[in-house]
Amino acid sequence: GVFEGTDKGAFNPTGILTREQAAKIVAVMLLGEEDANKLSTNSTTFKDVAANRWSAGYIGYCVQQGILAGTGNGNFDPEGELTGLAFAKMMLVALGYDAKVANYVGNDWAINVAADAVNAGIAPKGIVLADAMTREQAAQMAFQTLTADMVYYTNKGTTVIGSDGMQVI
């Protein structure tokens, strides 16, 4: 499934979501479990992600899709903690938002992500997006993302497709 237990077999709902766990969540949401689990790589872009690491395929997919990037100096920090803002940005990009067009890069990225996450209905009530995100909060945000509107950019502007498949804008 999208969420599995830790290597100790527990869901660990209050554990903090890591960057590599987030990559798996997004890959499974976009590709489906069967196809996401087939992702593999012979080499990686990052010094700290071995090609045989359990998450290397998910990370590679998310980087290739523009959903995730490294942390600098050729590193990814796969076990690094993720904030609610960072995960919301991933979810929004997965919904079709263009990070550059939506201004999710630069100094005001956090403000723009927070506003769009709330407007899109993917931010669970009662969480502080600037804080580290727990696994249970990530599960809730991922669920809410599954029912959110998709966004498509065309040469005529932005098109929003509702979760029911109907064009909204």
Language-model regions, residue ranges each:
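Feature responds to low-complexity, polar/acidic, surface-exposed segments characteristic
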Residues: 4-56, 65-85, 92-132, 146-169
